Amino acid sequence: MLAKQALNTEIEPLYGDDAISEAIRRMEALEVASLPVVDDTTGKLRGQVSLQQLEHAESDRSVSDMEMDKPVKIYDEQHIFEAARLMLQYEMRLLPVVDKEKTFIGYLGKTKVLESLTHMLNLAETGSVITVELKQRDFTLTEIVHLIESEGAKILGITVETPDVQAGVYEVSIKLNLRDISRVAATLRRHEYTVLTDSSNEILGVDVETRADELIKYMDM
């Protein structure tokens, strides 16, 4: 999914001639720590200001009088995964979206991004998760996918964690449409794969839910 497919166009950005008092009121109403500032003539993104900056400024001045930060933004053709990364890194509830000309076209909201990720990763689908450890030098999913499908399982989603630098391994979590994945786990072990989780759906579901909860926790700022 691309950023433009989850766009929110209902929330207005700040403009240079907006009063600081009004900008503060809007940020507090939206419960955000910053908002982008857009040129009211060209529609291009000028920068962004934080609530903390505004609270230390004279309330009768305008936003254009403020020293603006470099805006955090995403292009409309970028993937929703990049939006999630930026929101986590900068602790943002609203992420400005621009087109290739850097014209502001809307926002990505935290809730919409989470809904998109949940849909893409099939977190709402019934099934189980199996986590396999792979060494960096041996990293390939082709054989794993073949072995899983040979046991009649359907892969609903795959996530790969950044490898441990010292151990040099990836943790690959694979969501399957089966409740009982004992046969899949046994097959992978027979082919000398290290299976980190191989219990029932109820236990394995905790792994996915924990990862989702961690994402929600960091995005729910």
Mark where each language-model region is:
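Intrinsically disordered, low-complexity terminal regulatory regions
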Residues: P13-E28, S34, V206-T210, E214, ...
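Short acidic/polar active-site loop segments enriched in Thr and Asp
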Residues: A33, R93, K154
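Short, structured interface segments
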Residues: V49, E101-M120
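Histidine- and aromatic-rich ligand-binding microenvironments
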Residues: S50-L54, K112-V113, A186, Y193, ...
